[in-house]
Amino acid sequence: MARDPGAVRAVLWDMGGVLTTSPFEAFARYERERGLSPGFLRGVNATNPDDNAWARLERGELDPLRFDAAFAAESAAAGHRVPGSDVLALLVGDLRPGMLRAVAACRERATTALLTNNVTPLDAVEPEIAAVLGHFDVVCQSSEMGSRKPELEFYRTACARATVDPSEAVFLDDLGVNLKPARAMGMRTIKVETPERALDELAAITGWPVAAVDMQPEAPTHG
């Protein structure tokens, strides 16, 4: 039987800023505490975005020690020296239980996949974060794949592992730069600005009752 061309057969989820609170909140706090201009850290990461220290770290080309020095040099060139180790300490946010319940609801109806740019494989970090892996049929981590969002190879591999055509997938991410190439491939995309709004959009696309999943207030982000 031919597949329904409009059917959603996989839901792809980003980690930071989607399933957890955004590390950008921790970045902003760090900048305030040290008198840096707002958005300084993101600005460093946005300079030469395909080959800077951050990109090479996420592809597994730099270890944390070499990243520490490389990011310090790049940030110094931008006006303020920030050790890369300081940035790494800001990456882990707090889990959003309501989003994880939505993942579980989707998994009853489709393949669920986690698509994350990371430094350390999730099974090597905090137990609470590592436990997230059990919610997904497919896990794609830049630290293990040698490619990262928004590189097309990352998305092609994710769809192949989920055994879906891009047109059969919905992808949730908090960064437009990551969503743009996925949308160009044919995926339906949702930019996550708030969990509630994102789940409303997901429910509208799929027709599934994910928006009814009880959302809980988030705890403050920790560093």
List each model region and its residues.
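Generic structural signal for small/hydrophobic residues in well-ordered secondary structure
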Residues: 14-17, 60, 106, 114, ...
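Asp-based, Mg2+/Mn2+-dependent phosphohydrolase catalytic module
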Residues: 1-9, 13, 119-120, 124-223
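Catalytic-core regions built around general acid/base machinery
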Residues: 98-109, 135
